[in-house]
């Protein structure tokens, strides 16, 4: 399914792989996450360096963390990169992140399950991913 209900400034949507959540695409280079009207609906950012990406719900990306980075479709979720800590990945404080695959750990490929975020180092070598 394609979504066309992106917020102002976003371009018409396009479809990504069926293995991804429904998402909207913006023209590259991507400047910020593209949020749909409801905080419960999916959002995404597809930059020129990221051909396609899976996106997590907008409720997991507070407005203050609008700058997002994309990971390959095979990795599953995107991670939130806070402007104030560019060398860190923002992961939940009150719940454990879930590592997707071992090949993604060097990118900090973790999926938060709640919206309260804290900055942790990107470099993680243990199975719990930080």
From Swiss-Prot:
<keyword id="KW-0416">Keratin</keyword>
<feature type="repeat" description="7">
    <location>
        <begin position="85"/>
        <end position="89"/>
    </location>
</feature>
<feature type="repeat" description="9">
    <location>
        <begin position="95"/>
        <end position="99"/>
    </location>
</feature>
<dbReference type="GO" id="GO:0045095">
    <property type="term" value="C:keratin filament"/>
</dbReference>
<feature type="repeat" description="10">
    <location>
        <begin position="104"/>
        <end position="108"/>
    </location>
</feature>
<comment type="similarity">
    <text>Belongs to the KRTAP type 12 family.</text>
</comment>
<feature type="repeat" description="6">
    <location>
        <begin position="60"/>
        <end position="64"/>
    </location>
</feature>
<comment type="subunit">
    <text>Interacts with hair keratins.</text>
</comment>
<comment type="function">
    <text>In the hair cortex, hair keratin intermediate filaments are embedded in an interfilamentous matrix, consisting of hair keratin-associated proteins (KRTAP), which are essential for the formation of a rigid and resistant hair shaft through their extensive disulfide bond cross-linking with abundant cysteine residues of hair keratins. The matrix proteins include the high-sulfur and high-glycine-tyrosine keratins.</text>
</comment>
<feature type="repeat" description="8">
    <location>
        <begin position="90"/>
        <end position="94"/>
    </location>
</feature>
<keyword id="KW-0677">Repeat</keyword>
<feature type="repeat" description="11">
    <location>
        <begin position="109"/>
        <end position="113"/>
    </location>
</feature>
<feature type="repeat" description="5">
    <location>
        <begin position="45"/>
        <end position="49"/>
    </location>
</feature>
<feature type="repeat" description="2">
    <location>
        <begin position="15"/>
        <end position="29"/>
    </location>
</feature>
<dbReference type="InterPro" id="IPR002494">
    <property type="entry name" value="KAP"/>
</dbReference>
<feature type="repeat" description="3">
    <location>
        <begin position="34"/>
        <end position="38"/>
    </location>
</feature>
<feature type="repeat" description="13">
    <location>
        <begin position="119"/>
        <end position="123"/>
    </location>
</feature>
<protein>
    <recommendedName>
        <fullName>Keratin-associated protein 12-1</fullName>
    </recommendedName>
</protein>
<feature type="repeat" description="12">
    <location>
        <begin position="114"/>
        <end position="118"/>
    </location>
</feature>
<dbReference type="Pfam" id="PF13885">
    <property type="entry name" value="Keratin_B2_2"/>
</dbReference>
<feature type="repeat" description="1">
    <location>
        <begin position="10"/>
        <end position="14"/>
    </location>
</feature>
<dbReference type="GO" id="GO:0005829">
    <property type="term" value="C:cytosol"/>
</dbReference>
<feature type="repeat" description="4">
    <location>
        <begin position="40"/>
        <end position="44"/>
    </location>
</feature>
<feature type="repeat" description="14">
    <location>
        <begin position="124"/>
        <end position="128"/>
    </location>
</feature>
<feature type="region of interest" description="14 X 5 AA approximate repeats">
    <location>
        <begin position="10"/>
        <end position="128"/>
    </location>
</feature>
